């Protein structure tokens, strides 16, 4: 979604090894093809995604884990992906109660947990400048357009993850 894409765009402004994990292959493909992300990992319920992460990081896991899902399941397990003294950052929004079944990992690895939900007024000016200067390209996020008149019949198609919709735009008359 746009929160995860925004996080990726800001990470790309720095010289970092970026690894993206997702359950939907079309999203990983989008990251590879449009954002130039070299390392993408399909999440797997059997846990094989963790082995792939270890392979990419030389067994160290990730220094920074950003969870932009807003999914309680993802947020409660992302400690598993963080390296010793790593940081876990929540930028996704959830209204559900969040528990930490992996709290022993959190303590054992001496992790830092951060959360962010809002931007400050100064941030908006910086972001607008980055977009205007072409440092961040939000145009690629809009993969589908629909006229207002076609919303009743066409909107449901955007919920089909196999379409590869990143963001849909409804055009008003």
PLM features: residue spans?
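Short amphipathic alpha-helix with an adjacent loop that forms part of the alpha/beta core around
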Residues: 46-59
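Short loop/turn segments at beta->alpha junctions
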Residues: 45, 70, 147-150
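Short SAM/SAH-binding signature in class I
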Residues: 60-66
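Mid-domain Rossmann-like dinucleotide-binding core that forms the NAD(H)/NADP(H) cofactor-binding site
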Residues: 1-46
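Glycine-rich phosphate-binding loop and adjacent beta-alpha segment
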Residues: 16, 72-133, 172-173
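C-terminal hydrophobic helical "lid"/dimerization subdomain
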Residues: 6, 76-79, 121-173
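Short conserved AdoMet
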Residues: 12, 57, 70, 83, ...
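Short, acidic/turn-prone active-site loops that include or flank metal/cofactor-
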Residues: 24, 43-49, 93-96, 118-119
């Amino acid at each position: 979604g746009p929160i995860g894409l925004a996080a990726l765009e800001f990470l790309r402004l720095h010289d970092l090894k970026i690894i993206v994990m997702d359950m939907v292959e079309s999203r990983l493909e989008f990251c590879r093809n449009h954002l130039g992300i070299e390392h993408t990992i399909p999440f797997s319920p059997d846990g094989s995604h963790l082995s792939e992460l270890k392979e990419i990081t030389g067994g160290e896991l990730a220094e920074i884990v950003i969870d932009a899902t807003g999914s309680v399941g993802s947020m409660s397990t992302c400690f598993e992906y963080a390296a010793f003294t790593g940081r876990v950052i929540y930028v996704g929004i959830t209204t559900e109660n969040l528990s930490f079944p992996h709290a022993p990992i959190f303590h054992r690895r001496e992790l830092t947990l951060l959360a962010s939900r809002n931007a400050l007024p100064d941030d908006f000016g910086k972001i607008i400048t980055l977009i205007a200067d072409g440092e961040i390209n939000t145009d690629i996020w809009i993969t589908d357009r629909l006229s207002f008149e076609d919303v009743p019949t066409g909107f449901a198609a955007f919920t089909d993850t196999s379409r590869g919709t990143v963001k849909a735009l409804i055009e008003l008359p």
